[in-house]
Amino acid sequence: ELEYKYSGDKGVKIFGYTENMYEWMKSSSVLITKAGGVTISEALASNIPLILFNPVPGQEMENARYFKKHNMAKIAENQEEVLKYVEQLLSKDDIEMMKINMMKNYLPKASYNICEDIMSYLDSI
């Protein structure tokens, strides 16, 4: 449906499943996405500022609020806000500040540390 809708638009390319999402993300200045845990974690690890689109109540909203609170993302409720934030981020120093905040909040050994804590706890009981 999207391919048909945008078939005449040279500025839009619709991709299906891709094995090389990391490459697409690394070549991006900003990522517009839902606030799912895996995607925003990948963006954090890749240091790509986020525009989180219309997060649903629950985990997505909490993820979005956390990233916004720490100035690592903007939350857009509609397409107009997405465009506003893209223009804002690409024309100001905001995007660099978001990248700095992402570097500060990224914990590269988080999984390892969690496993170590669990093993330490299990050894103590």
PLM-predicted stretches and their roles:
Residues 1-125:
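Nucleotide-activated sugar donor-binding and catalytic core shared by glycosyltransferases
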